[in-house]
Amino acid sequence: MSKKTKQELENNKLSKRLRHAVGDAINDFNMIEPGDKIMVCLSGGKDSYALLDILRQLQASAPIDFELVAVNLDQKQPGFPEEVLPTYLESIGVPYKIVEEDTYSTVKRVLDEGKTTCSLCSRLRRGILYRTAKELGCTKIALGHHRDDILATMFLNMFYGGKLKAMPPKLVSDNGEHIVIRPLAYVKEKDLIKYAELKQFPIIPCNLCGSQPNLQRQVIGDMLRDWDKRFPGRIESMFSALQNVVPSHLADTELFDFAGLERGQTLKHGGDLAFDSEKMPERFSDGSEEDESEIKIAPQKAERKVINILANKPKTCGA
């Protein structure tokens, strides 16, 4: 097999893996429904480019109809290449809207020198995007956070916030007006890096947060990448833990009635047997990698009727 052919096979495998991971997340959390108008938030980074690209693929083949509109928030950062995103979006034929709001000056004016900008920037950006979604009549807002972002958020909340809290794949906004979805929830960041190289997306760096090397999130990200190299399967196992929560073996009295426990009650989640060691799944213990399209990360849930986004569109007569 030639080097070129081998690379083509690897690229096809990567594309299939990403498509299936996104499709599985959409199916598991019922992210997209018939007739949805989805606002895809496009920052110019690798993650949001990949999100839009994969959603377009699914839109073309899915058994349901839904609309996509790309939205970019031009925060008036110095040197921001305003022409890059419109040129790209017009070249692929995606409807889009560029929202111009000078949040850059606001963040720089309000925060002291040396302070991290992410929290304030995120709040300002979120409010503008919610307003834009309402103006466009969008039913869903799609963000480009991936699996590693979700895990990093969990550790940030544990280490610095004292909460066992991550980043939900799907949520309702605080005002109750918007459904926010994260279709990349099952996707590895390292796969997105490879995909961006394959697709040659015109990446735009962020001058606000990209220039702050000591951000807590970046430190956590470095920790996760180090673990992924030294302990194959650890990241997958941690994400699986987010989907297999046992409230009776934590310490939150709001989630479980510890005070009401009495002798003779039915065992809850195995009782003290839950402390016994369990056999580690082979793909976690030996570091081997399987075809991601065959791995079902989510635990088995109650039967419910969902539309498989990975299925094909129904054929029409005469097609």
From Swiss-Prot:
Binding site for [4Fe-4S] cluster: 118, 121, 209
Catalytic reactions on record: cytidine(32) in tRNA + S-sulfanyl-L-cysteinyl-[cysteine desulfurase] + AH2 + ATP = 2-thiocytidine(32) in tRNA + L-cysteinyl-[cysteine desulfurase] + A + AMP + diphosphate + H(+)
Chain ranges for the short sequence motif PP-loop motif as given in the UniProt record: 43-48
CDD domains xrefs: TtcA-like
Gene Ontology biological process terms from the UniProt entry: tRNA thio-modification
Compartment annotation: Cytoplasm
Cofactor note: Binds 1 [4Fe-4S] cluster per subunit. The cluster is chelated by three Cys residues, the fourth Fe has a free coordination site that may bind a sulfur atom transferred from the persulfide of IscS.
EC number(s) from the headed UniProt entry: 2.8.1.-
UniProtKB keywords: 4Fe-4S, ATP-binding, Cytoplasm, Iron, Iron-sulfur, Magnesium, Metal-binding, Nucleotide-binding, RNA-binding, Transferase, tRNA processing, tRNA-binding
UniProt keyword tRNA processing, yes or no: yes
Primary location: cytoplasm
Source organism, top-level taxon: Bacteria
Coiled-coil regions listed in the entry: none
Assigned GO CC terms: cytoplasm
Pathways per UniProt: tRNA modification
Keyword flag Cytoplasm: yes
GO molecular function ontology, one term from the record: tRNA binding
Cofactor(s) of this protein: Mg(2+); [4Fe-4S] cluster
Note, other: The thiolation reaction likely consists of two steps: a first activation step by ATP to form an adenylated intermediate of the target base of tRNA, and a second nucleophilic substitution step of the sulfur (S) atom supplied by the hydrosulfide attached to the Fe-S cluster.
Function: Catalyzes the ATP-dependent 2-thiolation of cytidine in position 32 of tRNA, to form 2-thiocytidine (s(2)C32). The sulfur atoms are provided by the cysteine/cysteine desulfurase (IscS) system.
Subunit structure: Homodimer.
Family: Belongs to the TtcA family.
Protein name per the record: tRNA-cytidine(32) 2-sulfurtransferase
Organism: Neisseria meningitidis serogroup C (strain 053442)
